Amino acid sequence: MMRNQNLLNYIKNVLEHMPTDWLLLTTHRLDIYNEEQAKTEFLNQLDSLFETKVFSTSALAELPTAFDYIRLGHPLSSILEWTIAGLQGLQAEQVVAFASQTMPVLSVLRKNLLQHKHTHIYYSEELPAEFDFEALKQVYGYQFEVKQVKHIEDVHSFDGSTVFLSKTASFKTLDLHPSIDFLVQLDEELGSVLVANGDSSKNYIPDIQHVRRRESIAMTPPNAFAALQKLVGQTPTSHSKKEEQANRSSVINSIHNITDTSSEVVLGSCGLSVQYAIMMGLIDHAQQNYPDQPIKIIVPPNCYGGTND
């Protein structure tokens, strides 16, 4: 209990003294990036700073880069995962923060489809409208059952994976019931956090990270910052919807100007996620409009790895 309070106090100081580019950066510093160690090196040095109670801006700025792309992760998402894991007595790798609320579930379903393993998805509160389970079955071919329960204690383990979806005001208190393999903590404004619960779930982590890397993005720097503020009991810095809309309009105008078109623009979190959405949207369209026709995907041999995926 004392260590948890010390951890939260330390995070308060980190948020107060962190380098400004942690929140605003769009490109990582590769001069302090070691690809072979990457996030491990970042967390090891963060551990050392925590143990020695060092949180100066200069010390935090010298922490090595954990990822080579912002969409894969960044200092604030890494610290969020590290903090949640520390509060729960878990390893940092067991916690994965997503910008999306649905992608954590898809990452487990994808792994289980390849492993020919069934999945039970439980929830107690009303789910966000983004969860279209019928589409997941029809378009992706995922095999799972969805069950609503009153309490987390009503979840029963079976010879497969159990996923529990929870909505909360904070990521601080997680109910890791032993019958749950994966807890997905949802925040409608910030994204979600997936926790791999128990030793048997740890071998899913590379596959979960793979989906976040190739088909989605990590929780964004501003949202990870807000989540950390919630963790330490602070009121999250207000996010201006007006500013967000202005930025969105600016991007759309740029697209219209560059392409010399006036067609509708749909924006995504990153290039790979847009490609992914286009591909799965085409499959969904084909299934609905040409149900008796086979679907074939042609991938050129020199296609970029992420697109191949």
Please report, for each region that a protein language model flagged, where it lies by residue:
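Conserved N-terminal alpha-helix of the aminotransferase class I/II PLP-enzyme fold
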Residues: M2-L106, R110-D309
